[in-house]
Amino acid sequence: MRAYNFCAGPAALPTAVLEKAQQELLDWQGKGLSIMEMSHRSADYVAVAEKAEADLRKLMNIPENYKVLFLQGGASLQFSAIPLNLLGKNNKADYIHTGIWSEKALKEAKRYGDINVVEAGIKVDGKFAISEQSEWNLSDDAAYVHYADNETIGGLQFAGVPDVKAPLVCDFSSSILSAPLDVSKFGLIYAGAQKNIGPAGLTIVIIRDDLLDQAKAEIPSILKYADQAKNGSMVNTPSTYAWYLSGLVFEWLLEQGGVDAIHKVNLEKAQLLYGYIDSSDFYNNPIAIPNRSIMNVPFTLADEALEKQFLKEAEANHLLNLAGHRSVGGMRASIYNAVPLEGVQALIRFMDDFAKRNG
């Protein structure tokens, strides 16, 4: 049987998608070869790539004046690519700091520009939270404002989209496609694929057309969004299989009823899990309710010494990858789009049984 996979990334993929990929692996649509072996310049592959983009545009309702790029190097490469692409005419940017991933982004940006760090991570009644925008020291003349919507490691998520004057840039790696989003509020959106989009090796960048001419002169051509946009994200050979598989995920999402429909399921999963944790004396979640992530649910046990036993027994019950990030410890259940409601229900049953036996 397939286990329930709560990994933060590379994450669970829909079983139907994996089955279709398996079925097409050796002989893609009767062509006598795998799509992995196909030239990225061939008419067949270009059609696959174009359909993936069209389906993503449909899912996210992406306006015409935005380019969608299918790039390589993970979201971490974009920590450099973004300032190199956007600080060519104005060297100043604001970075909102709420956790480990936004910190990685701002540290990299400091190598290329004059970065104003907005400290927005706070504690409310002992729980981690994000401060009100009225308390932020935003610049009047920033080229852009950067934030990470969902801190995958901490399980901390913005309750809404910040309202700023400068173009808004956001790392949506662990929350893209999990809830409806007004793309027109952003100058640039980026996301590593390996959580809600597809397998590792692909990064999506959605950029408004007017920002394509802001690059620094010294930017490597492979990182230049304008060059990638002109060349259909194929300045060099793209991650063809990851692009294809992501296209299958987009098809699957459309079949589920799109982002609105999957969002309802995601809310149900999150409410069930947080509801159980809050009702328990044995488990604790460290995040203030308004800023709880609907994708990444961290929790601790009443006795830290039981963690290894919890993970071992969880694995024996086909509940995988529940260890928290090495930097923070504890547990974390990542409940992305492909994790079914039944998986969360099975996790809660196990957690309840474990607490009764060890509490």
UniProtKB/Swiss-Prot annotation:
Domain of life from the UniProt record: Bacteria
Pathway linked to the protein: Amino-acid biosynthesis; L-serine biosynthesis; L-serine from 3-phospho-D-glycerate: step 2/3; Cofactor biosynthesis; pyridoxine 5'-phosphate biosynthesis; pyridoxine 5'-phosphate from D-erythrose 4-phosphate: step 3/5
Binding-site list for pyridoxal 5'-phosphate: 75-76, 101, 152, 171, 194, 236-237
Annotated keywords: Amino-acid biosynthesis, Aminotransferase, Cytoplasm, Pyridoxal phosphate, Pyridoxine biosynthesis, Serine biosynthesis, Transferase
BP terms from Gene Ontology: L-serine biosynthetic process; pyridoxine biosynthetic process
N6-(pyridoxal phosphate)lysine PTM sites in chain numbering: 195
Gene Ontology terms, MF aspect: O-phospho-L-serine:2-oxoglutarate aminotransferase activity; pyridoxal phosphate binding
Assembly notes: Homodimer.
Known function: Catalyzes the reversible conversion of 3-phosphohydroxypyruvate to phosphoserine and of 3-hydroxy-2-oxo-4-phosphonooxybutanoate to phosphohydroxythreonine.
Protein name stated in the entry: Phosphoserine aminotransferase
